[in-house]
């Protein structure tokens, strides 16, 4: 579960390393974000000489959470970290690579470009 002030790792090569969630996109009363939700975040740590810089406000989609994700078939998926992929206004990733595994639920939420870049889909 991701809420405002949560720190996340970045799972792509866009230039950001750490993000802090500041808002969850959707209904005004959303308290937590889960896998596949879009958030507004601020970059807390970035790689030098890259397009994205520190203290820049961006959009990102959650691809991994420490909180368990229960599927309809009874399978439970849990990751070791909270991670997100930086996206633009149209929902396309800003980076050209995605690191680590991502959940299959992103394909159902029309993030097919992110799914195609991922090395492993669980």
Swiss-Prot record:
UniProt name for this protein: Large ribosomal subunit protein uL14c
Subcellular compartments: Plastid, Chloroplast
KW Ribosomal protein (keyword) present: yes
Keyword terms of this UniProt record: Chloroplast, Plastid, Ribonucleoprotein, Ribosomal protein, RNA-binding, rRNA-binding
Span of the signal peptide: none
Gene3D superfamilies tied to this protein: Ribosomal protein L14
One Pfam assignment: Ribosomal_L14
Entry's Gene Ontology molecular function annotations: large ribosomal subunit rRNA binding; structural constituent of ribosome
GO biological process: translation
GO CC aspect terms: chloroplast; cytosolic large ribosomal subunit
CDD domains: Ribosomal_uL14
NCBIfam families tied to this protein: rplN_bact
Subunit text: Part of the 50S ribosomal subunit.
Stated family: Belongs to the universal ribosomal protein uL14 family.
Entry annotated with the keyword Protease: no
Function: Binds to 23S rRNA.
HAMAP family assigned: Ribosomal_uL14
Organism: Nymphaea alba (White water-lily)
């Amino acid at each position: 579960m991701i809420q405002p002030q949560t720190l996340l790792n970045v799972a792509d090569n866009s230039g950001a390393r750490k993000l802090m969630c500041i808002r969850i996109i959707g209904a005004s009363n959303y308290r937590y974000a889960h896998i596949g939700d879009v958030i507004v975040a601020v970059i807390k740590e970035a790689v030098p000489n890259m397009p994205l810089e520190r203290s820049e406000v961006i959009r990102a989609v959650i691809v991994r959470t420490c909180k368990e994700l229960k599927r309809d078939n009874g399978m439970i998926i849990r990751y070791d970290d909270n991670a997100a992929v930086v996206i633009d206004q149209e929902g396309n990733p800003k980076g050209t690579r995605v690191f680590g595994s991502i959940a299959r639920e992103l394909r159902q939420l029309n993030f097919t470009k992110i799914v195609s870049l991922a090395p492993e889909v669980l």
